Swiss-Prot record:
Enzyme class, UniProt record, top EC level: hydrolase
Functional summary from the UniProt entry: JH esterase plays a crucial role in the decrease of JH activity in lepidopteran insects, by hydrolyzing the methyl ester of JH. It is also involved in the transport of JH.
Entry EC number(s): 3.1.1.59
Name this protein carries in UniProt: Juvenile hormone esterase, isoform A
Keywords for this protein: Hydrolase, Serine esterase
Length: 109
C-alpha cells in the first residue's frame, strides 16, 4: 500500500487486498484506522458500508451481516454481548457435525 498522509483521502477498505495490514486500512467513513477503533465503532462502520451506493463497492461474493439478540452465558471475550468468534460456535454450531475432523484428530493418524 502507498503511505497515506494526514490530508490524503483513504482508500475504501472494500477495494484493498485481504492481506493488507489493518493498521494501514482506514475506514474512509469515520476517519479512524480500524486498528484504533473501539468495537462499537467497527459496528457503525459496517452498517455505513452497507449503505454505500453500488458504484462505490467492489464486485465480489455476497456478504451477510448478522446481529444476534442474545447474551452468551459463558462469554470469554465480552461480558455484555457475544463476540464474533462465539457467534460462530453458539449460533451456527459448526462443531456439532460428526463428519468434520478436528486438527488434533488429523495429527493422530
Amino acid at each position: 500500500l502507498p503511505s497515506l498522509s494526514a490530508d490524503a483521502e483513504a482508500p475504501s477498505p472494500l477495494s484493498l487486498k485481504a492481506d493488507a495490514p489493518l493498521a494501514h486500512i482506514d475506514s474512509g467513513l469515520l476517519g479512524v484506522p480500524y486498528a484504533k477503533q473501539p468495537i462499537g465503532e467497527l459496528r457503525v462502520t459496517t452498517l455505513r458500508l452497507i449503505e454505500l451506493p453500488p458504484e462505490k463497492l467492489v464486485v465480489g461474493a455476497p456478504v451477510y451481516l448478522y446481529q444476534f439478540s442474545y447474551e452468551s452465558p459463558s462469554s470469554a471475550i465480552k461480558q455484555e454481548v457475544v463476540g464474533h468468534i462465539e457467534d460462530l460456535t453458539y449460533v451456527f454450531k459448526g462443531s456439532q457435525y460428526q463428519d468434520i475432523e478436528s486438527p488434533t484428530a488429523y495429527q493422530s493418524k
